[in-house]
From Swiss-Prot:
HAMAP family: Urease_alpha (MF_01953). This is Urease subunit alpha. Its EC number is 3.5.1.5. The modification N6-carboxylysine is found at residue 221. Its cofactor is Ni cation. It comes from Streptococcus salivarius (strain 57.I). Binds 2 nickel ions per subunit.
Length: 572
């Protein structure tokens, strides 16, 4: 005899199912369940008197020698990923996702995809949301506290450059030369996050960049503060092509070495990742945004300009002055800062993101951006665009899935593809490392509940350890066991060039983390950017008014006074 439950009661017990929608934080975005892999009446739920007990949902006989037995089951999760919005159990074994479907005991349950045994831990995610760990491709390694602040917003992978608060690192995302690359690789070896380092892309000879890739850099960054010249870009791209590493550029704001067209010519159709493609973070003034329409360019934004608010412009001017070592007493320095900040291009940037013309969201951490706000700003922007532009094509009432999948891709899979690490991380898919973020729907985008790194709980909301339960206040984000000891080395990744990997960089400099090579970075086009592959035929910026036109139509939006995911969640 079957037992019937009404939809509301079912959702309270087992989480939403097909036909239900979940509101994301205090935004007006609703994620609708597209498919439910669990079986009604046979859900694998943990707890006293529930299913995951010996001989019921837990196999009484299967040992870990059976590869179908997982180390961890995340039960009844609502998964939000570029691949879809689904309800499923997630099986994790040896630090990787091995199954997404239905977990339990095959002796008592039908159609089980993976086995829960005596060796299996359970994380109850009924009513919770699971996303892939976020990836920030634009981090200035200035403070050693950056990984912790990133984890606060579900960012588990950092790419960038720097050596600490040196002026070169304050301004540019480059870790220059073998000495600094080696020492920084060693410095982050005990930090609970994945890391990659960008070499300094300058010089009229390829050898000056090549030696940095051999030393373990996982990509190349050309920055105007070190000189973004035609020769420097061309030679850096030659090295990138030779060693299969990503190439990123912060172009010439002052147009000293050439204009936007000259830089575009220096690319020669080769794959390029353009930082802060709007321009306030730097780049050809006023028309760097033209790059967002080129097939060989993978364009990203930095989060201080997203979403466009009434306070954005004033904040940006101050940030430019501090970040780029400018003197407010020197008129030319002030003019330099003012040339980079244009409300018209900031307004257009929001719309280009919503159209899928800007593919990636990053932070520019500590150098005009905030590492702990990458995911949050993404969802604030998505919410703003829904309010100002309405539903995307295919979306409907209580179903914003197309927009949600577009925006989650901006800080998960697309940065992974761009920097050659998508085989390892960047999505909730079988075979990838279990870098996962678990959210309560009411806190989604603002504050994670738990962060897993390589299948181990590493960071999360935790109460007073001196109390009788884990729930008493103060409940704040704290390091968990995965952030300590040898566990850090077994659950976190360091990315290097294939050359450095093949030549034993891990052993040479004594790294303990899992070291992996980046790959497949050089034949990418805009079409490889998941759900964010729109390349307008023409993007034109009026040199006098700075108005932005896409295919001859003005693109703009209004600033907002308040955002979602803001003061309702934070004291300051």
């Amino acid at each position: 005899m079957s037992f019937k439950m009404d939809r509301e009661e079912y959702a309270q017990h087992y989480g939403p199912t097909v036909g239900d929608s979940v509101r994301l934080g205090d935004t007006n975005l609703f994620a609708a369940i597209e498919k439910d892999f669990t079986v009604y009446g046979q859900e694998s739920k943990f707890g006293g008197g529930k299913v995951l007990r010996d001989g019921m949902g837990v196999s009484a006989t299967e040992t870990r020698d059976n590869p179908s037995v997982v180390d961890t089951i995340i039960t009844g999760a609502t998964i939000i990923d570029y691949t879809g919005i689904i309800k499923a159990d997630i099986g994790i074994r040896d630090g990787k996702i091995v199954a997404i479907g239905r977990g339990g005991n095959p002796d008592t349950m039908d159609n089980v995809d993976f086995v829960v045994g005596a060796s299996t831990e359970a994380i109850a995610a009924e009513g919770l949301i699971v996303t892939a760990g976020g990836i920030d491709l634009h981090v200035h390694y200035i403070s050693a506290d950056l990984p912790e602040f990133g984890l606060d917003n579900g960012i588990t992978t950092l790419f960038g450059g720097g050596t600490g608060p040196a002026d070169g690192s304050n301004a540019t995302t480059c870790t220059p030369g073998k000495f600094h690359i080696t020492r920084m690789l060693q410095a982050v070896d005990d930090m609970p996050a994945n890391f990659g380092f960008l070499a300094k892309g300058v010089g009229s000879e390829t050898e000056v960049v090549e030696e940095q890739i051999k030393a373990g850099a996982a990509g190349i960054k050309t920055h105007e503060d070190w000189g973004a010249t035609y020769a420097g870009i061309d030679n850096s791209l030659k090295v990138a092509d030779k060693y299969d590493v990503s190439f990123a550029v912060h172009t010439d704001s002052l147009n000293e070495g050439g204009f936007m067209e000259n830089t575009l010519e220096s690319f020669q159709g080769r794959t390029v990742h353009t930082f802060h493609t709007e321009g306030s973070g730097g780049g050809h003034a006023p028309d760097i945004m033209v790059f967002a329409g080129k097939e060989n360019i993978l364009p990203s934004s930095t989060n201080p300009t997203n979403p466009y608010t009434t306070n954005a412009i004033g904040e940006l001017l101050d940030m430019v002055m501090v970040c780029h070592h400018l003197d407010p007493k020197i008129p030319e320095d002030v003019s330099f800062a003012e040339s980079r900040v244009r409300k018209q291009t900031v307004a257009a940037e929001d719309v280009l993101h919503d159209m899928g013309a800007l593919s990636i969201m990053t932070s520019d951490a500590m150098a005009m951006g905030r590492v702990g706000e990458v995911a949050m700003r993404c969802w604030q922007l998505a919410d703003k665009m829904k309010a100002q532009r309405g539903p995307l094509e295919g979306d409907s009432e209580f179903n914003d899935n197309n927009r949600i999948k577009r925006y989650v891709a901006k800080y998960t899979i697309n940065p992974a593809i761009t920097n050659g690490i998508a085989d390892y991380i960047g999505s909730v898919e079988v075979g990838k490392f279990a870098d996962l973020v678990i959210w309560e729907p009411a806190q989604f985008g603002a504050k994670p509940k738990l962060v897993l790194k390589g299948g181990m709980l590493t960071y999360g909301v935790m109460g007073d350890a001196g109390s009788s339960l884990p729930t008493p206040q103060p409940r704040i984000m704290r390091k968990l066991y995965g952030a300590y000891g040898q566990a850090v080395h077994e659950t976190n990744l360091t990315f290097v060039s294939q050359y450095a990997y093949d030549h034993g960089i891990k052993e040479e400099i004594g790294l303990n983390k899992i070291v992996l090579p980046v790959k497949n970075t050089r034949n990418l086009t805009k079409r490889d950017m998941k759900l964010n592959d729109y390349a307008p035929k023409t993007i034109r910026i009026d040199p006098q008014t700075f108005d932005v036109f896409i295919d001859d139509e003005l693109v703009t939006c209004e600033p907002i006074h308040t955002t979602s995911l803001s003061q309702r969640y934070f004291l300051f």
